[in-house]
């Protein structure tokens, strides 16, 4: 028996091999804008880069792009990406309609524990909110919603659901054997659908009416639903798909129908057209409805109208509903949804960049809301609609585009004021030292803009923002991980002696091979 000789060979990883530079292209202003926003999402500290450093960063990220620093500046100015002047920003908060609180109070308070109640908000345009009726301790459970208004299967799992590889209700991947599935009655007799548990099968009340052509419900047409569902899936139209499932659920059981309709009508509403016209991103790195993966069309009307036509064909009872009402349903879903579901009680929580509540959603779509810190009696319960680790510009942009308001919470106000002070201080330093050539002071850029911030003062505003944002209330690591879809670890300000050595990976690997 021969023994193979081994030698050590160093190879380059496949994904690190240098690629040939692409053909130079001139990006559109929309592409530049959305890549700036994407950069802020990936690296929040980049929000405070001055113009030259930001330009360098953009060129490194997009080696085949040909554009000059003036183009970048024009994009930042025209899209108010660095503006902290509220008068320059469009919002649609004044167009959002809130049902009278007297019409919804009994619906909400009947479902809330005695420690929480709904009230009208004193602040203009906030509508309604949830308030503590007594002191609440940190970590205390505030309220629990066992199910959303109507459970909506995840649209991104529809292909797997149709093939029986994911649960027809919750979308979880299935690993049970066929014998186990059949033994426990978790398979469907009329199609390939399978459920992960008896609980999911019982909750999937719309399945036989939407998926089986033999349905006896005259208000639901499964064949048309199949076309509607595929249209939504192909166009990542989550809102329309969700509205369809919710409406189907309301048609199946009379008692449940009344509750679903009452809860849905109690939610704040706005036309999707108004939201679209106020947005300014195509979502390739943008922010408009990005949480549920939506793409923004240049002209969404054909997409909306086709969805509407298929919707009223699927549900004959909606024939008199009207196209504009359908758009209101879409807008209502977007401004109230949480993780692609409509939770009735949670929808009454208002936003703050320093929230005092947090939530947990398990794989069965049960929602629990806890006190993130001590809450005083009569204090409003507030959640965060956006990633709290993002910078003030990106947070306010996401809130303005998706929920229609410009946030002026204490945290935003402090960070904006800090930017203004730094901008003025550095501007004076630059002017006094006659080094204005390094600073962009074009008339379109207000001195309150971080574009005017240079690193000549020995420290970046990102350092100041990071230290000041939630200094006194900054949660620990576990808290930061809760309710955030993204998470960035900051480099420590100082390295202690006991700090363990980091493992560094490069783009080569050594391996033993046979000679």
Swiss-Prot record:
Top-level class of the enzyme under EC nomenclature: transferase
Disordered: annotated span: 452-476
Gene Ontology terms describing biological process: methylation; negative regulation of gene expression, epigenetic; telomere maintenance
Tree of life domain: Eukaryota
Chief localisation class: nucleus
Keyword line: Chromosome, Cytoplasm, Methyltransferase, Nucleus, S-adenosyl-L-methionine, Transferase
Compartments where found: Nucleus; Chromosome; Cytoplasm
Catalytic activity: L-lysyl-[histone] + S-adenosyl-L-methionine = N(6)-methyl-L-lysyl-[histone] + S-adenosyl-L-homocysteine + H(+)
Signal sequence, renumbered to the chain: none
All residue ranges annotated as the SET domain in the record: 114-386
EC number(s) recorded for this UniProt protein: 2.1.1.-
GO cellular component labels: chromatin; cytoplasm; nucleus
Matches recorded under Gene3D superfamilies: 1.10.220.160, 6.10.140.2220, SET domain (2.170.270.10)
Record family assignment: Belongs to the class V-like SAM-binding methyltransferase superfamily. Histone-lysine methyltransferase family. SET5 subfamily.
PANTHER family: HISTONE-LYSINE N-TRIMETHYLTRANSFERASE SMYD5, SET AND MYND DOMAIN-CONTAINING PROTEIN 5
UniProt-recorded name of the protein: Histone-lysine N-methyltransferase SET5
Lineage: Eukaryota, Fungi, Dikarya, Ascomycota, Saccharomycotina
Name of encoding gene: SET5
């Amino acid at each position: 028996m021969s023994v193979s000789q081994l030698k050590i060979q160093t190879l380059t990883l496949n994904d690190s091999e240098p690629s040939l530079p692409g053909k130079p292209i001139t990006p559109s202003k929309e592409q530049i804008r959305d890549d700036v926003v994407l950069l802020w999402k990936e690296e929040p500290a980049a929000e405070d880069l001055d113009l030259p450093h930001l330009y360098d960063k953009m060129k490194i990220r997009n080696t085949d792009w040909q554009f000059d620093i003036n183009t970048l500046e024009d994009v930042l100015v025209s899209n108010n990406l660095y503006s902290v002047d509220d008068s320059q920003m469009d919002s649609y908060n004044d167009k959002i309609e809130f049902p009278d609180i007297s019409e919804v109070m009994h619906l909400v308070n009947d479902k809330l524990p005695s420690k929480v109640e709904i009230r009208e908000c004193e602040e203009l345009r906030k509508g309604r909110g949830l308030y503590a009726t007594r002191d609440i301790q940190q970590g205390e459970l505030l309220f629990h919603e066992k199910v959303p208004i109507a459970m909506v299967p995840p649209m991104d799992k529809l292909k797997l659901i149709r093939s029986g590889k994911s649960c027809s209700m919750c979308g979880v991947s299935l690993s049970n054997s066929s014998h186990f599935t059949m033994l426990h009655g978790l398979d469907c007799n009329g199609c390939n659908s399978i459920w992960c548990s008896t609980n999911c099968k019982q909750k999937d009340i719309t399945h036989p009416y939407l998926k089986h052509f033999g349905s006896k419900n005259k208000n639901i047409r499964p064949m048309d639903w199949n076309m509607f569902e595929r249209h939504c899936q192909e166009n990542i139209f989550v809102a329309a798909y969700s509205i369809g499932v919710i409406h189907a659920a309301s048609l199946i059981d009379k008692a449940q129908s009344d509750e679903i309709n009452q809860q849905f009508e109690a939610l704040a509403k706005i036309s999707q057209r108004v939201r679209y016209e106020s947005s300014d991103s195509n979502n390739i790195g943008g922010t408009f409805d990005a949480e549920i993966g939506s793409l923004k069309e240049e002209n969404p009307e054909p997409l909306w109208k086709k969805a509407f036509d298929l919707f009223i064909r699927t549900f004959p009872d909606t024939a008199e509903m009207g196209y504009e009402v359908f758009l209101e349903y879409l807008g209502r879903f977007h401004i109230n949804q949480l993780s692609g579901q409509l939770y009735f009680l949670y929808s009454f929580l208002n936003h703050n960049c320093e929230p005092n509540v947090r939530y947990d959603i398990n794989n069965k779509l049960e929602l629990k809301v806890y006190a993130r810190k001590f809450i005083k009696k009569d204090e409003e319960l507030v959640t965060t609609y956006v990633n709290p680790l993002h910078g003030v510009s990106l947070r306010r942009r996401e809130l303005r585009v998706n929920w229609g308001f410009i946030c002026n919470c204490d945290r935003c106000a402090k960070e904006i004021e800090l930017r203004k002070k730094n901008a003025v201080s550095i501007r004076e330093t630059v002017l006094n030292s006659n080094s204005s050539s390094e600073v962009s002071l074009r008339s379109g850029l207000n001195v309150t803009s971080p574009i005017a911030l240079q690193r000549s003062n020995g420290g970046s505003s990102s350092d100041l923002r990071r230290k000041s944002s939630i200094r006194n209330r900054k949660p620990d690591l576990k808290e930061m991980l809760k309710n955030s879809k993204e998470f960035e670890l900051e480099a420590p300000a100082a390295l202690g002696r006991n700090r363990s050595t980091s493992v560094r990976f490069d783009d080569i690997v050594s391996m033993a091979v046979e000679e």
